[in-house]
């Protein structure tokens, strides 16, 4: 059932984004005041001939974060989906969905939250004990600013996607930024605030 729902979600996303590229040079701004952020492309690998895999490092809240993008091999600018993983996951979370979008002509920028991965070898800096929904909101704001400025991105077609805790973070962030074309949330953890209150009553 989960795969069926994912397939339906991807189909809806494809319909919403469209895959027509554009050569426009507009920029996307966020209302958030974020720290100075840097980007560095350090790897570029061809995959399947349908897309290029690019890896990035950028800074958020004083932590170095790892990001990976699937960029379609097409001319001009393309729609962009910025993906936020769930608690304890990483950029490979829902990877098949990311690849399917890239093969359909939609770029996907996925990053690892600071302290948000339970991997024994996390790609981003930060401790789990230092991570919260609010720190992840800031991470996503910085990711939006970085990704929206990429040369292959159509700034009028930037979408946010998140799953589980990443879905909650995506929804909260969308309330504070501008020029986001749409949201796609997979089983968002909207119950998390109530769960925490019930676990730690006053």
Predicted regions and their residues:
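Conserved alpha/beta-hydrolase
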Residues: 101-122
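The serine-hydrolase catalytic nucleophile loop
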Residues: 88-99, 113
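Hydrolase active-site cap/lid region
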Residues: 172-202
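Alpha/beta-hydrolase fold nucleophile elbow
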Residues: 152-163
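N-terminal cap/lid segment of alpha/beta-hydrolase-fold proteins
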Residues: 36-74
């Amino acid at each position: 059932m989960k795969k069926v729902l994912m397939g339906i979600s991807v189909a809806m996303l494809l319909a919403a984004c469209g895959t027509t590229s554009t050569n426009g040079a507009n920029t996307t701004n966020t209302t958030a005041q974020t720290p100075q952020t840097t980007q560095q492309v350090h790897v570029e690998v061809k995959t399947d001939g349908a897309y290029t895999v690019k890896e990035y490092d950028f800074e958020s809240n004083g932590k170095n974060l790892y990001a990976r993008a699937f960029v379609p091999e097409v001319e001009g600018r393309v729609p962009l989906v910025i993906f936020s993983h769930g608690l304890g996951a990483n950029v490979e979370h829902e990877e098949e969905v990311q690849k399917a979008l890239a093969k359909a002509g939609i770029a996907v920028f996925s990053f690892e939250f600071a302290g948000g991965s339970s991997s024994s070898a996390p790609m981003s800096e930060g401790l789990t004990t230092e991570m919260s929904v609010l720190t992840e909101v800031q991470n996503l704001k910085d990711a939006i600013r970085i990704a929206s400025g990429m040369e292959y991105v159509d700034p009028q077609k930037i979408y946010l996607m998140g799953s589980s805790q990443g879905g909650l973070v995506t929804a909260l962030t969308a309330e504070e930024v501008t020029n986001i074309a749409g949201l796609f949330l997979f089983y968002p953890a909207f119950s998390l605030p109530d769960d925490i209150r019930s676990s730690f009553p006053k």
